[in-house]
Each structure stands twice: as structure tokens, then as C-alpha cells.
């Protein structure tokens, strides 16, 4: 609604609308039209407007795509709320999380943390599960400096080979679940749309995809942590993945190994821990060295 308002004002008056104006429009106008908005956490609405504004600014400054209207049928639903006056609490003893406008919720807490809570993002994935991501301000201790550098060669047969000869196997996660997914997709095709059995099968497919994603991320996190911990400087090839997946024979295998996710993890973990991660040109003979 605020995106439509912003667009309408610009088309009629040729005037730019700020995120503060959009927030005021939401409080003064939209809450009158849609009574249920008064029941929603105010920070969730403000953050949604600020996210829309960030996407709008990105469209002009970084030539990104124009912000899209979100459908209520979107599989990925989420909102962010801010911490103030103890409105977000985590009880590790009772495994409960308290959020604004909600009572204490029982949760599976993955690990304890110490620090000041800044915000919480609540999301629902296609399988129907809910997740809460807590942003905490805490002191970070960098890894100790070491005199060890490495070059890594990314591949399909072996996911990664270091210049020291260390090999990380390709777990081929999609291949392991491929038969199960094909079977479930066939079952779904024979179900009556919008029936109870249709949604049950759809949920099974979503859970299978979720398992693939979580297994892959877990493997990549352990692998990237090991590479960062053992080396001060890490060098890899700057692969043009978008061009490579155009080869239909290799597309599935390339998507399964998730080179982009691995290099993304190496990049931010290197910054966190005082390491250096370097990407070299595609045409540099890195494979011969590794």
C-alpha cells in the first residue's frame, strides 16, 4: 500500500515521498481503512516500510529491479521487530521466547548467547515451520594470526581442493533426495488441487527441500570455518556461475555444489576473523597451481 501511495504521489505531483511520509500515511490513513493493522506490532510495520524504502532507493542508485508488491500467498513470510523496554526476551532455562503482541512461545533454542538484543525476525518457511532470528550486539574475538596461506580450486567431482592438497568431497545432496522428490512430485500431480491430501503432499515436498537446504548449509559452514581457521590468506577463482549454469548438462551439478554460498561464507568469515579472502581472474591458471 505504501509503495502504491509513493508511486501515486510521484505520478500526480512529481514529488518524492520519504520513508517518514510513508510511515505517517500508514498511521493516519491505512490504520483507519484496515482496522486489523492496529493489532500489528508497530515496529513490524515501520520496518516493512523502511525495507520498501531501501529497495526503492536501490532501484535508483544501484540499477536494481523496481520493488514488487508482495502477495499474501507468498511462501516466504517474515517480519522484523525491534527491541525496546524488554519486549523481546529469551528464556534458555524454559526454552521460551517472548515477542511483542505475543505470549511466551515454546521454542527449540540452538545455542545460548550473551549480549544486548537489538531485533528479532520472525519467518515462516514453505514447510510451515516458524523461525525466530535474534540479532544481538556482542563482543567478537578474532581468530589468532597464523602464517599459513592457501589457494582453493572449486570443482564438481571434488567440491574444493586446497593448494596443500587437502580435498573436500562433494556430498551430492540433491542426488541423495532426487528419487524421493520425484516420487512426491508424481503423487502431487495425481492429487486433487486444494484437497487435504494435496496440501499434505505439498508439505512433504517442502520438508524435503528444507532438508536439502539445511544439510548443504551445515556442510558448507563447517567447511568454510575449517578453511578460515587454518589459513590467514585464502585465494579462489572468481567464477562466472551465471554463465556456467547455462550449460544444461552441468546446471544441476553446479547448483548442487553451491559455489556462490561457499565463497559468500568465506568472504564474510574472513572479515570477521581478520583474515584476507581474495578472488582472482577466471583466466588465471589457478587449477594448475592447485
Question: Language model features by range: what are they?
Answer:
Residues 1-7, 48-56, 181:
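Short, Φ-rich (hydrophobic/aromatic) sequence segments
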Residues 1-20:
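N-terminal cap/recognition module
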Residues 7-11, 60-65, 232, 270-277:
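Surface-exposed helix-capping loop/turn segments at secondary-structure junctions
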Residues 8, 35, 39-42, 50, ...:
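Short capping/connector residues at structural and topological boundaries
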Residues 16, 20, 24, 43-46, ...:
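An alpha-helix initiation/capping motif
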Residues 21-125:
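Acidic carboxylate diad motif detector
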Residues 113-116, 126-290:
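Positively charged, helix-rich recognition surfaces that bind polyanionic ligands
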Amino acid at each position: 500500500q505504501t509503495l502504491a501511495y509513493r508511486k501515486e504521489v510521484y505520478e500526480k505531483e512529481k514529488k518524492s515521498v520519504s520513508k517518514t511520509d510513508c510511515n505517517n500515511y500508514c498511521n493516519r490513513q491505512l490504520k483507519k481503512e484496515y482496522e486489523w493493522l492496529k493489532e500489528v506490532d508497530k515496529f513490524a510495520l515501520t520496518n516493512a516500510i523502511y525495507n520498501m524504502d531501501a529497495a526503492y532507493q536501490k532501484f535508483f542508485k544501484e540499477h536494481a529491479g523496481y520493488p514488487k508488491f508482495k502477495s499474501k500467498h507468498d511462501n516466504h513470510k517474515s517480519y522484523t521487530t525491534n527491541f525496546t523496554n524488554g519486549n523481546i526476551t529469551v528464556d534458555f532455562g524454559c526454552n521460551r521466547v517472548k515477542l511483542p503482541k505475543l505470549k511466551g512461545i515454546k521454542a527449540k533454542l540452538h545455542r545460548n548467547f550473551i549480549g544486548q538484543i537489538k531485533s528479532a525476525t520472525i519467518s515462516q518457511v514453505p514447510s510451515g515451520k516458524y523461525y525466530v532470528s535474534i540479532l544481538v550486539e556482542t563482543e567478537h574475538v578474532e581468530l589468532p594470526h597464523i602464517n599459513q596461506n592457501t589457494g582453493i580450486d572449486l570443482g564438481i567431482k571434488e567440491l574444493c581442493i586446497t593448494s596443500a592438497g587437502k580435498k573436500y568431497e562433494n556430498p551430492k545432496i540433491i542426488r541423495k533426495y532426487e528419487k524421493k522428490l520425484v516420487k512426491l512430485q508424481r503423487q502431487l500431480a495425481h492429487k486433487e488441487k486444494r484437497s487435504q491430501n494435496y496440501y499434505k503432499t505439498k508439505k512433504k515436498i517442502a520438508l524435503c527441500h528444507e532438508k536439502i537446504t539445511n544439510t548443504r548449509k551445515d556442510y558448507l559452514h563447517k567447511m568454510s570455518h575449517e578453511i578460515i581457521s587454518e589459513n590467514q590468506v585464502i585465494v579462489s577463482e572468481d567464477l562466472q556461475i551465471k554463465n556456467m549454469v547455462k550449460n544444461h548438462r552441468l546446471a544441476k551439478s553446479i547448483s548442487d555444489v553451491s559455489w556462490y554460498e561457499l565463497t559468500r561464507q568465506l568472504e564474510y568469515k574472513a572479515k570477521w576473523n581478520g583474515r584476507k579472502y581474495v578472488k582472482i581472474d577466471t583466466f588465471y591458471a589457478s587449477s594448475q597451481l592447485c
